Amino acid sequence: MKVAIVHNDRVTTQVAVRHLQVLLAEKGILQDQQHPDLVISVGGDGTLISAFHKYKQQLDKVCFAGIHTGHLGFYTDWRNYDMEKLVDALASHPVEENEVGYPLLDMKVTTSCGEKRFLALNEASIKRISKTMEAEVWLGGERFENFRGDGLCVSTPTGSTAYSKSLGGAVIHPRLKTLQLTEIASINNLVFRTVGSPIVIAPDEWITIVPKISDRVVVIVDGERISLTDVQKVDYKIAAEEIRFYQYGHHHFWERVNDAFIGDR
């Protein structure tokens, strides 16, 4: 088995990475940053999202595991003091026999220059710079509503505990193949009327957002701002690809939710 390590620059993370490298070498597990079987992120959720985007062209070949060295992470099952357990598990419980797959977001942006495709692990949002955004919202090829407000966010189930939740979105179990559309500060009047609540679509449906004014529209994918001009429409659907996580030691999803937002156990 070959392992790649992606990490942030915190001092505690650097110490953990050096220790992890020693543990892997002791078990005879090779390190290969180019063509790994397993990508281990060391840091937090942001580090794992960076690791996902770094290796998104190899999703059919790689699995992910996360070690968090700071605050609780939804994608990081292991703490830095658990690394011996993780490496022992990798040596005795093969990755290909202990993995779970979660859905990703496929976003296609159509501009006057053509089409561009993006993959998101958490969410993709669309906004207008400095002014209110006006757009038509289509669901499954049928016109649904006229939107006016700060913007719209489409999230995956794993992303439902991130930005979408802060917008009032539902928390969705990551094994469900669905996408969720949430509004960002919508304005309702006689011309622009929205449903006013999050929308969850079926696996075979898709979401289309058509801005009324195509210039000065900003698209943000997993927190990264994408510079595009003359955005004519944006289509969202569940991606054919999925992200796979090393499942051995994988924490129960609702346990994570409780620990992150309630903490009364």
Swiss-Prot record:
The UniProt keyword set, sorted, is: ATP-binding, Cytoplasm, Kinase, NAD, NADP, Nucleotide-binding, Transferase
Q: Single GO molecular-function term?
A: ATP binding
Question: A Pfam family for this UniProt protein?
Answer: NAD_kinase_C
Q: Which GO terms describe its biological process?
A: NAD metabolic process; NADP biosynthetic process
Residues annotated as binding NAD(+) are 45-46, 122-123, 148, 150, 161-166, 185
Q: What is its main location?
A: cytoplasm
Q: Where is the active site?
A: 45
Which cofactors are named for this entry? a divalent metal cation
Tell me the enzyme class. Answer: transferase
EC numbers listed for it are 2.7.1.23
One GO CC annotation: cytoplasm
Q: Per the record, what are the reactions this protein catalyses?
A: NAD(+) + ATP = ADP + NADP(+) + H(+)
Q: Where does it reside? A: Cytoplasm
Q: Give the UniProt family note.
A: Belongs to the NAD kinase family.
What this chain does, per the entry, is described as: Involved in the regulation of the intracellular balance of NAD and NADP, and is a key enzyme in the biosynthesis of NADP. Catalyzes specifically the phosphorylation on 2'-hydroxyl of the adenosine moiety of NAD to yield NADP.
The protein, known as: NAD kinase
